[in-house]
Amino acid sequence: MKVLVTGAAGFIGFHVIQKLLATEHSVVGIDNLNTYYDVALKRARLTQIGVDPKFDFRKMDLSDRFLVRELFSAIKPDRVIHLAAQAGVRYSLENPQAYIDSNIQGFLNILEGCRHNDV
């Protein structure tokens, strides 16, 4: 089964991907690697997954509906595990648009990708 995991470089996404790969699923991991959390730590997590022919990482922003549409058409996932989100309550007061883009528009784009591709 091909599984799309958003938020792939985050703590939870990283562990979910490891479990999926251990159970013979193929995984496409998506993350925008934003700087809210340490990017070096995110890259280290992706490196720890290692070179696995069943894993494909793509850096992208889920708020771009055209990229998300192209992604779904290209990879044709069987399942989606959506873990991507802009975290941090205090930061939401400083930069509310980042939350709208990631947590609302990004989620809507994932839902639309699922809807249009029978996921």
Regions found by a protein language model. Name each.
Residues 1-119:
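N-terminal Rossmann-like NAD(P)+-binding domain of SDR-like oxidoreductases, especially those catalyzing
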